[in-house]
Amino acid sequence: MNDSQRVSILSEALPYIQSFSGRKIVIKYGGSVMENDNLKKAFFRDIALLSSVGVCPIVIHGGGPEINNWLKKLEISPKFENGLRITDQKTMDIVEMVLMGRVNKQIVKGVNKTGSLAVGISGLDGNLIQSRELGDGSHGLVGEVTKINPEILDPLISKGYIPIISSIGSTMEGISHNINADFVAGEIAAAINAEKLILLTDTQGILKEKDNKNSLVEKMNLKEARNFIDKKIVTEGMIPKTECCIRALAQGVKAAHIIDGRIEHSLLLEIFTNSGIGTMIVA
């Protein structure tokens, strides 16, 4: 890349930097980006850059592969049903240990190495994420969000800290739940009136044709997103991600993005370029 191209990129990014300065952007961090060292480093730098230009990033993470690794070490067989982890108390203990004590702190350290200041918390801190058992409770301690109490985030964000949040919630009685990180991100985005919700995934975004990489939908509205689900154009693991975006938008989030986390700096490409890199859904 020559100097002229670098200047052109900065020039293209400037209006977006000005527009989003001081705005909150909630980012769900997951998928391959959590397992590849180069992608992790690029993500940490992207978060640092967002913060340095005045954007307020809030990162929500899961940690499925790391949880599975630790279950294997402890000779516990992971069990899934309809894409959801069956979570008994022994598994929940591992989930809490891995997400809160290991994955969360690895992300915090990665961001802090860039010179930014990240703070790791979970949904238990400050009663941030209140939850209940999902559905009929057949998945055990898998939960769904009942309420977000975002007050704990305000002093962190106002002082320039980057919240890194693990997707564990609890009941008022103190029973912990393992919650899908996409839905946690969507609910937190709505609760803090975020400008954007961005889901990093292992897909390009929403495709018109499942197996056609050239059929990426770059922009769609709520009605179109719902139609894609109803007509089964969106299938399998993309259904909950799309539903999460729809719910966040219905609660006031201005835009939701599903982007390919397998591409280095996809976060910056989506936010700061004219063409973007994934699918943007707007109300």
UniProtKB/Swiss-Prot annotation:
InterPro entries: AceGlu_kinase-like_sf, AcgluKinase_fam, ArgB, Asp/Glu/Uridylate_kinase, NAGK-C. Keywords: Amino-acid biosynthesis, Arginine biosynthesis, ATP-binding, Cytoplasm, Kinase, Nucleotide-binding, Transferase. It catalyses: N-acetyl-L-glutamate + ATP = N-acetyl-L-glutamyl 5-phosphate + ADP. The record marks 28, 241 as: Transition state stabilizer. The keyword Acyltransferase does not apply. One of its GO terms (cellular component) is cytoplasm. GO terms for molecular function: acetylglutamate kinase activity; ATP binding. Pathway: Amino-acid biosynthesis; L-arginine biosynthesis; N(2)-acetyl-L-ornithine from L-glutamate: step 2/4. It holds the Pfam family AA_kinase. Its main location: cytoplasm. One of its GO terms (biological process) is arginine biosynthetic process via ornithine. Its EC number is 2.7.2.8. It is found in: Cytoplasm. Coiled coil: none annotated. Belongs to the acetylglutamate kinase family. ArgB subfamily. PANTHER family: N-ACETYLGLUTAMATE SYNTHASE, N-ACETYLGLUTAMATE SYNTHASE, MITOCHONDRIAL. HAMAP family: ArgB (MF_00082). This is Acetylglutamate kinase. It comes from Prochlorococcus marinus (strain MIT 9312).
